[in-house]
Amino acid sequence: MKISTLAVVSAFAVTAIAGPVRPDGIGSDKYLIELGPGETQWVTKDQKHHMRAAGKTFIDITDEFGSGFTTTEVVPANYPKSARHASLIKPLIANLSKENLMRDLTTLTKFNNRYYESDTGVESATWILQQVQKIIKDSGVKGAKVEKFTNQFKQFNIIATIPGSSKSTVIVGAHQDSINSKSPMKGRAPGADDNGSGTVVILEAFRNILKSKAIQAANATNTLEFHWYAGEEGGLLGSNNIFKKYKADGRQVKAMLNQDLTGFTNNGKPEQLGLIADNTNQQLNEFCKMIVKQYASIPIVEAKCGYACSDHASAHRNGFPASFVAETSYRNTNPYLHTDGDVIANLNFNHMLEHAKVVLGFMGELAMAPNL
């Protein structure tokens, strides 16, 4: 275990507490981050931003200091080896709309930024919440709901639920926040790719899965959740809060798919999807490969992105099987991330449709999977 700033870090907590505890000599301006299993460091908020700008990934675990957090055995799951519900899912895929993606992303990128501690970060989250509320109302699906999951910072998480007949839960998530690494609070951060693209992809998938006859008839075996996370750019803050809570509550999360960066295609080079192979669940990754082969039109290749590179890591460290399908084989190919240049003009909406196909395939197949 690597310890810095003269602090002895002995344990972590399951759930966030009202006021983070800090050891003697560590001021309120310091945050505890985890850069790898057992590798922790106390840093300032500015240092966190500089580390993210330099490509260093981590989880902010300040709220876990001194409270006995332990890793958990992975929740067991039994994934289908082949697609069994193409007749239900392919009509939904055919109804996916590139125009919806463009419209929603245009609105989302008009906020000055979606930084998790800024007023516009709250305004953008409120806009997403309102879209989800409208989608549910228009669908007429009984039992479908959306709620806020609040954090200790301004921006809130959003959780939409489609109930199934079992307690087993399948999740797709995307972080909603954006950041300008040079000026986090006030700087322009349209965040079109990072991660407006993932935000609107799962919004469009949610819009269409509610049109499923099986969902409308309440025939889903497993509960589905769509998550929009706050504060990813601060160290996976919102997603870690959720999955710590789910762990403490004994939730049976059988699968989590992360959608972060879904629109950049590396200047016209052959398109592919990137399946992140590190800090993910191998069995679920194999299921993702099958889903891509069955429902997408481009190939998938394995890649690595390091510890805590995105919100799937929050599920993974809390014992829930997680996968991450990104836009390319190498996560950082988009040179505009965390700048005012991360704009819609750099994105490929056809590529984003491929991600939406994968999300619908993933959620549709697992919604109906028996004995998951």
UniProtKB/Swiss-Prot annotation:
Where in the cell does this protein reside? Secreted
Q: Name one GO biological process term.
A: proteolysis
Residues in the signal sequence: 1-18
Cofactor requirement: Zn(2+)
List the Gene Ontology MF annotations in alphabetical order.
Answer: aminopeptidase activity; metal ion binding; metalloexopeptidase activity
The answer to whether the entry has keyword Zinc-finger is no
Where is it mainly found? Answer: secreted
Which Pfam families did the record assign? Answer: Peptidase_M28
Q: Which keywords does this Swiss-Prot/TrEMBL entry list?
A: Aminopeptidase, Disulfide bond, Glycoprotein, Hydrolase, Metal-binding, Protease, Secreted, Signal, Virulence, Zinc
Details of cofactor binding = Binds 2 Zn(2+) ions per subunit.
Per the record, what is one GO cellular component? extracellular region
- Enzyme category, top tier: hydrolase
Q: List the disulfide bonds.
A: 305-309
Q: What is its EC number?
A: 3.4.11.-
Q: Which InterPro entries match?
A: M28_fam (IPR045175), Peptidase_M28 (IPR007484)
- Provide the binding site for Zn(2+) 2: 194, 233, 338
Annotated glycan sites = 95, 195, 219
Instruction: Name the job this protein performs.
Output: Probable extracellular aminopeptidase which contributes to pathogenicity.
What family is it from?
Belongs to the peptidase M28 family. M28E subfamily.
Q: Subunit notes for this chain?
A: Monomer.
> Can you say what this protein is called?
Probable leucine aminopeptidase MCYG_03459
Q: What is the lineage of its organism?
A: Eukaryota, Fungi, Dikarya, Ascomycota, Pezizomycotina
